[in-house]
């Protein structure tokens, strides 16, 4: 009897465990349908939605908790892949947001600030929930490594439950973000149309004025004979050329007068310089002439003295007669 009860208990536990394994990999069909619908939209959406679709596909693969997934979860490969996909998604999302902000320039500052604040909050929620996914997988890896070979069925079940909840939160975040972006894009489109309308309102009166002026000139010209119009053009051209010639002659006369003034000034300055040079030369002559005359007198006296001394030494000396 005890053996029978033991066999029944073993069979029951094996059935429970066998039922648990597919449960980790299986998702309710009602939950999967909206995900598939949203994923189809992501595949044909903006670049940030395509990046989000790649992140979602990788997360679905992780949630299967297959043997390969469990092996990679024990290393840092899964978290590294998720980090790269998260960074790519947020980068594309920021680029798309910046593009919409440029298109929102014609919109009022208050409206643009409010839309930007709401969109930034939705973007932050999506980033936080994606970060929760990565943190939860990192925590699972730490818990598995700490068990040291013990059974990890309970950890896998708890991880699968957490991942399902996080995926639901991510779906809500993405839906909210898409709605905010749609409002943002509608505001940008409205602002662009408003800017074009304002430009059109300013240009239409100018175009009408130009048309009216062209029509007036055309009608006045059409009413004149061709010969009269040619004569009128010739008279205007002749008057214009005479005006240009008169201005040119006046300008040449001014240049000639300026040249004459410059030449007269140069001649005057040259004459002044000649007079100054002659006066300086006369002053030098008056300085040095007395000195030269004095030197000449001294030299003549010296020569006379030398000649006298030479003559005296050359005179014969009388000898003794013995």
Curated annotation (Swiss-Prot):
Keyword presence, Coiled coil: no
Residues annotated as glycosylated: 216
Residue positions, PTM Methionine sulfoxide: 147
Record's keyword annotation contains Phosphoprotein: yes
Chief location bin: secreted
Region spans: Specificity for association with VLDL: 283-295
Region (LDL and other lipoprotein receptors binding): 162-172
Ranges for region Homooligomerization: 271-322
Pfam (any one): Apolipoprotein
GO biological process, one term: acylglycerol homeostasis
Sequence-type repeats, residues: 84-105, 106-127, 128-149, 150-171, 172-193, 194-215, 216-238, 239-260
Entry function: APOE is an apolipoprotein, a protein associating with lipid particles, that mainly functions in lipoprotein-mediated lipid transport between organs via the plasma and interstitial fluids. APOE is a core component of plasma lipoproteins and is involved in their production, conversion and clearance. Apolipoproteins are amphipathic molecules that interact both with lipids of the lipoprotein particle core and the aqueous environment of the plasma.
Complex and partners: Homotetramer. May interact with ABCA1; functionally associated with ABCA1 in the biogenesis of HDLs. May interact with APP/A4 amyloid-beta peptide; the interaction is extremely stable in vitro but its physiological significance is unclear. May interact with MAPT. May interact with MAP2. In the cerebrospinal fluid, interacts with secreted SORL1. Interacts with PMEL; this allows the loading of PMEL luminal fragment on ILVs to induce fibril nucleation.
Protein name listed in UniProt: Apolipoprotein E
Organism the protein comes from: Ateles geoffroyi
